Amino acid sequence: MEIIFTVNHNNLIAFSDLNSGQIFKMVNTDDVRTFGEDCLCMKTDTGDLVILAGTKYHCGMLCEPDCYLSDGSNTIMEKVPNAVIALT
């Protein structure tokens, strides 16, 4: 699975999966944070931080283990264990 970030003029990020063509919830860039070597987290509607890239071994316990995406609802929709992240 390949995940692409798209940042628009309103400072929002859309997450899209090129393999399925699905576009996930847009979030404000203030809710997306990077840390460590290879970690990226997104704050979901529930206020939880989840890892989009990296693993718990790289990221420690700052985010939920493994990788998740939000579908814009109050639930974390999809586990993405080996996501490749690219910024466009």
Question: What are the residue ranges of the model-derived segments?
Answer:
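Short coil-to-beta transition motif at edge beta-strands of beta-rich domains
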Residues: 16-30
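Mixed-charge, Lys/Arg-enriched low-complexity segments
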Residues: 75-88
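Short stretches within intrinsically disordered, low-complexity N-terminal or propeptide regions
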Residues: 16, 55, 85-88
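Acidic, low-complexity, intrinsically disordered interaction modules
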Residues: 27-76
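Conserved beta-strand residues within beta-sheet cores
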Residues: 12, 38-40, 81
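Mixed-charge, Lys/Arg-rich low-complexity intrinsically disordered regions
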Residues: 1-19
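Polar/charged alpha-helical tracts
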Residues: 1-2, 20, 45, 81-82
